Amino acid sequence: MKLFHISHTDLDGYGCQLITKEYFKEGFFYNANYGLEVKLSIKKVLEQVLEYKEDEIIILISDLNLTFQEAKDLDNDVDKLLKNGYKIKLQLLDHHISGKKSAETFPWYYLDDKRCATKIVYDYMFEEYEGFDCNTSDWLKPLVDAINAVDIWLENEVKNFEFGKVLMSMIIKVREINNILFADLNRDFRCYLLKQAAKYLDEVDGHIKLDNDVHFMKKDFLKLSNKDDTLDNLSATYLVKTLVDVKDDLTVIYKGHKGLLTYCLGSISIPANAFLRANPEYD
């Protein structure tokens, strides 16, 4: 089965993808905010599925409410693929009430405003598939409950709500890996942090301990050796390594000079100089 999963760009959206990554292990993942990003992500998925006519395909959209026109267009596009012999299951799982009209019109559009999307996706894994074993559920279910508490604002669930607030802040502040140029790595980074954060759920004042340790969790992910360094330096070294991995795709030649064309990278001076030192063939 080939999974294509589009989700939102916040804690709830990445929580959904942590779940599908744990279950399916591999797939094609995209994150989008509303408007044009959603349209482009859907367009990309519909182009990619053309390569997998012999496979069973699931297109999952989570924590994103489509406009009625977007839902209608997607329904028509998938229907055409089905008539051409593709084996596609389309499913949208969301909790935003603004999608009510679409949910009442299209059977694949599931809406429940009493649960966040992460919790809906988690339950869906048990309803439609085999769910998770006890070892995974033991850490994943409490994490889902914390995300649910903060996303739909359940202040009465004090422990989950406070923990969820730290999770939300942690995910918002992931800036060490660019989410445009390195979307997959950025997503993996966020999912890593969420999975590590789950270890604090059973601790006394776990939300405070997690808040204190996020800095060190980031450093552990970014370290390419056992040598410790500042977070900025580790980020720069990691960025240089990722740029080297894709430098052939980003290289430009102009008037005999060799350069690297990057985009959407802020605070570039430190990693740029580190890249040039490590790759002297570039001007």
Residue ranges and their predicted role:
Residues 144-247:
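Hydrophobic, aromatic-enriched interface-forming segments
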